[in-house]
């Protein structure tokens, strides 16, 4: 086994992209990194572990200060590669708060790297849709976010983060991030007299689009607004030429999973986020 770190996204793509595309939905995060030409890549970790024949057995990507993202080729367990990666990261002093990967791989890496000192932060169901199912629409219509939505949208963002237990969304930073979406046809509001739900095209892969930040305030839940917003945005993304859409759903929330399945999304795998203690 041989560990290799890459200094830019092009060289990483040359070795890893074909492997990652074999499970494009599962690997939508590291694939999205490849298209990013930011100067910050110099601080990233883009790496592979190759077997004795030069084939990629394990892919790793990390954009500090976020989690390490892992993928075992064809989801075939390879503890030798995982152990080597852990040793190399410790040797180079590369630190990160946790690991994000298919459930079994995340657990095996965390056991090896942290000597069992970790906890599960979240479990996400990665889902894929190739065609939107026919379903009744709720009253209202979808529209792009506007500047005058910034009086409420950052607070929805903070509430989303709190409910999903993902990260802290402070209002000034969230406002800045949302403002970047204005005029770009990526952030959408479902409006029924007043704004009632939201969904975002958060990133794209080579062939697909990822729907993120789906949120409906408690006052407007149970009326089908989220279903209508997600279904409509999903169809818009397919109409733009994407071959499929993907999203992450809380694996422990049967309500949201049920909503997405009715729209046409299907389970791909469980992704665990494990934090080191």
Positions of predicted regions on the chain:
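Conserved acetyl-CoA-binding loop-helix of GNAT-fold acetyltransferases
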Residues: 77-88, 212-216, 222-239, 258-262
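Conserved beta-strand-loop-alpha-helix junction that forms the acyl-donor binding cleft
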Residues: 100-106, 247-257, 274-277
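Conserved GNAT acetyl-CoA-binding A-motif
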Residues: 93-102, 237-249
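Short amphipathic alpha-helix that is part of the acyltransferase structural core
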Residues: 1-29, 132-167
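Conserved donor-binding loop and adjoining core beta-sheet/short helix segment
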Residues: 4-7, 18, 24, 32-92, ...
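Conserved active-site tyrosine of GNAT-family acetyltransferases
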Residues: 110, 260, 265
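Acyl-donor-binding surface of acyltransferase catalytic domains
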Residues: 63-139, 274
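Acetyl-CoA-dependent GNAT
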Residues: 61-66, 161-165, 172-212
């Amino acid at each position: 086994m041989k560990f290799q770190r890459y200094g830019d996204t092009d060289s990483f793509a040359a070795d890893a992209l074909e492997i990652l595309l074999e499970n494009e939905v599962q690997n939508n995060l590291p694939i999205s990194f490849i298209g990013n030409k930011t100067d910050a890549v110099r601080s990233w970790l883009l790496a592979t572990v190759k077997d004795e024949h030069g084939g990629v057995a394990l892919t790793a990507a990390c954009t500090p200060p976020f989690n390490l993202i892992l993928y075992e080729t064809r989801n075939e367990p390879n503890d030798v590669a995982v152990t080597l990666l852990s040793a190399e990261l410790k040797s180079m002093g590369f630190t990160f708060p946790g690991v994000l990967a298919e459930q079994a791989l995340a657990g095996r890496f965390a056991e090896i790297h942290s000597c069992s000192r970790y906890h599960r932060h979240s479990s996400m169901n990665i889902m894929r849709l190739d065609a939107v199912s026919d379903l009744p629409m709720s009253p209202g219509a979808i529209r792009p976010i506007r500047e005058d939505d910034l009086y409420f949208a950052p607070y929805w963002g903070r509430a989303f983060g709190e409910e999903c237990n993902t990260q802290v969304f402070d209002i000034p930073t969230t406002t800045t991030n949302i403002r970047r979406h204005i005029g770009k046809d990526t952030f959408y509001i479902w409006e029924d007299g007043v704004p009632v739900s939201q969904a975002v095209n958060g990133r794209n892969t080579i062939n697909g689009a990822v729907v993120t930040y789906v949120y409906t305030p408690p006052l407007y839940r149970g009326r089908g607004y989220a279903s209508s917003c997600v279904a409509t945005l999903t169809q818009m993304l397919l109409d733009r030429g994407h071959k499929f859409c993907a999203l992450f759903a809380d694996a422990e929330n049967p309500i949201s999973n049920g909503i997405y399945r009715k729209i046409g999304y299907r389970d791909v795998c469980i992704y665990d986020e494990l934090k080191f203690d």
